[in-house]
Every structure is written in structure tokens, then in C-alpha cells.
A protein has these predicted regions:
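Second-shell loop/turn segments in exported
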Residues: 23-30, 46-56, 108-112, 149-161, ...
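His/Asp/Glu-rich mid-to-C-terminal helical/loop segments that flank catalytic regions of hydrolases
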Residues: 296-328
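A non-catalytic alpha/beta surface segment that caps or lines the substrate-entry region
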Residues: 51-124
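Acidic/His- and Gly-rich active-site-bordering loop/insert found
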Residues: 43, 69, 111-147
Length: 328
């Protein structure tokens, strides 16, 4: 009898503990290392052939991401999870640089030297206010294969940017795990063609019918390495200078939730380039960008998953979920 009473007491206390959790804490608790490892190890595997935009590995990656969104219960932004687009290179253009110009496609086709078909992956959790949007995104493409190299020829891109993709997926799941509908529509964006000139995010911005209703964009690009070995918790936190509250949010959440991060806060007056956040900043949309800086394996075949700081990936994902919770 005493044993049964103790068991009943334990179960009651456990139930009270769960019910005492806030919605945001439920979401935060769902973010974990094993999920990050599963996503990154798959995306950075040799089977995906370096995920070059317009080629087989990138196509498989987009299918994988869409299937996970569907499995989680995240709705497609439109009729499909995919936003297809074509990128063109003119005959005399610089090698590796392509363009997306949906308004001048006929003229481009007359001058085209090469065409690559790409597609973004876009999911959404509807908000209470259906007229406003916030976006969290990361590019999923990388550099593919270079047969001219000796030895390892596959650019696996574990940090760049399988790490960012894992964060966006975990944030989507965290919003669902919270059990609370966001105030604004939250779009989960996975960009194709970033390595060829931010093509996917540029296309989205150029064709978006609700661009003026987007209230903020959070970007991930390379969030898993230690640029400074003596500072394993360091992360660069770029944000739009006109929105100093973005810095206040992160400082508050580090204190409140004990996040193991040491941010290098960088407020930017001018639009920030270098990654997909630039496409949004150029049209006046406030941005946040998490980045752990370049390292010796940047854009090298040696950018492998076994070199990542997994604790940092998880802590940045948690911090950015809290950012998005406030932004939404």
C-alpha cells in the first residue's frame, strides 16, 4: 500500500511539473543534440554529393526537408512545399555566377549560356494575425563535387550549411511542441542556390506578394564551429541596428535560461550581405543572423560533421527559437 501511495504521489508531482511548464519552455525542451546530429549527418553524407544547386544531391535534400515538414505537421506555404525557379548564366558572365530575373525571363533566355532548375522549400505555421509574417531560414545547397581534386572530392558542407538547416527544422518542431499558436504567421524557409549568389532568397523576395507584411527575418549560416578555440561558446550575432531590442532579447534569454553562449553583438546600419539575410535587409526588412565565423575547413572538402561543436549548435538553436518566439 505504501509503495502504491509513493508511486501515486510521484506521478501527481510529475504531472504538476509538466503542467507548470510554460508554452515556450515546452518548445525549448524539444530542441536536442540527437535531432541536430541526425539531420546534419544525413545532409553532409557523401551520398548527397555536396548538395550543389541544380543537381541531384540538392534535389534529394529538398525532398528530405519537405518530407520532414510534412511529418511534423507544418503546412506548405502555398499549394506545395516547393518554390521552383530557374537560374541563368549569360555566355560572358563570370564563372559560377548566375541570375534570377523573373520579370525579364524572355530576354535572358535569348542570351542564356546555362540554365539550372532549383527550388526553395517553404513551410508555414499560421498565426492569429494572418496578415503579418516572420521568417526563419537557412540555405541547404553547397558546392558539390570537384573531380579535379586529389583525394576527397566532395564538399560535404556540414557547417556550411547543414548546421543551419538543422536549426530551422528544430525551431519548427519547437513551435509545434509549445502547443501555442503564434501571433504572426511563421515561415520556415530553406533556400536553394545560396552558394551561386543568394539565388533562392533573391527569387523569394523578388516574387513575394506580401513582402511589405514581413516583419522580420532570422538567418542561419554556419553555426557549428569554433573560429576561436579558446572561446568555444562564441557566436557572432548580427542584427539591424535600428532594432536594438534584438540585442536586448538575446541578453535577457541568456540570463533567464542559462544559455551557454558568448555572443559578439554586431549592430549593422547598412544592409548586411554575405548570406541570405542580405536579400531581406536590402528591402528594409529587419534581420538577425547567427554565424560562428569562417574556419580552415570553410569551402573545403574537410567540412565534416565530426568537426562540429554540437553543444554550440544546440544552444544557438535554443537562443534563436526564443528570438522567433518574441518576433512572432
Amino acid at each position: 500500500m505504501k509503495k502504491n501511495i509513493l508511486l501515486l504521489s510521484f506521478l501527481c508531482n510529475f504531472s504538476l511539473l509538466l503542467s507548470a511548464q510554460t508554452n515556450v519552455e515546452k518548445g525549448l525542451q524539444s530542441i536536442n543534440r540527437s535531432s541536430a546530429e541526425a539531420t546534419i549527418n544525413f545532409l553532409a553524407s557523401d551520398e548527397l554529393q555536396g548538395r550543389e544547386a541544380g543537381f541531384h544531391g540538392s534535389r534529394v535534400t529538398s525532398e528530405y526537408i519537405a518530407s520532414l515538414l510534412q511529418w511534423m505537421g507544418v503546412s506548405p506555404l502555398a499549394d506545395s512545399y516547393f518554390q521552383p525557379f530557374d537560374a541563368y548564366r549569360k555566355e560572358r558572365q563570370k564563372k559560377g555566377r548566375l541570375e534570377v530575373h523573373p520579370d525579364s525571363i524572355v530576354k535572358l533566355k535569348q542570351e542564356v549560356h546555362q540554365k539550372l532548375s532549383m527550388r526553395n522549400v517553404l513551410g508555414m505555421i499560421p498565426g492569429k494575425n494572418t496578415k503579418e509574417y516572420v521568417i526563419v531560414g537557412a540555405h541547404f545547397d553547397h558546392l558539390g563535387i570537384d573531380p579535379a581534386l586529389d583525394g576527397d572530392q566532395i564538399y560535404n558542407g556540414a557547417d556550411d550549411n547543414a548546421s543551419g538547416v538543422s536549426a530551422v527544422l528544430q525551431i519548427a518542431r519547437a513551435f509545434l511542441a509549445s502547443g501555442q499558436q503564434p501571433e504572426r504567421n511563421v515561415i520556415f524557409a530553406f533556400w536553394d542556390g545560396e552558394e551561386k549568389g543568394l539565388l533562392g532568397s533573391k527569387y523569394f523576395v523578388q516574387t513575394c506578394p506580401f513582402l511589405s507584411q514581413i516583419k522580420g527575418y532570422l538567418n542561419f549560416d554556419m553555426i557549428g564551429r569554433n573560429n576561436k578555440p579558446q572561446q568555444p561558446k562564441q557566436v557572432v550575432y548580427f542584427y539591424t541596428a535600428a532594432h536594438p531590442v534584438f540585442e536586448d532579447w538575446l541578453k535577457e534569454d541568456i540570463r533567464k535560461y542559462g544559455l551557454q553562449l558568448e555572443p559578439d553583438y554586431r549592430a549593422w546600419e547598412n544592409p548586411i550581405g554575405g548570406s541570405d539575410n542580405g536579400s531581406f535587409a536590402k528591402v528594409g526588412i529587419p534581420i538577425i543572423w547567427y554565424h560562428t565565423d569562417e574556419h580552415p575547413d570553410y569551402h573545403q572538402p574537410s567540412d565534416h560533421a565530426d568537426r562540429l561543436n554540437w553543444d554550440k549548435v544546440v544552444e544557438i538553436t535554443k537562443a534563436s527559437f526564443l528570438n522567433m518566439w518574441k518576433m512572432a
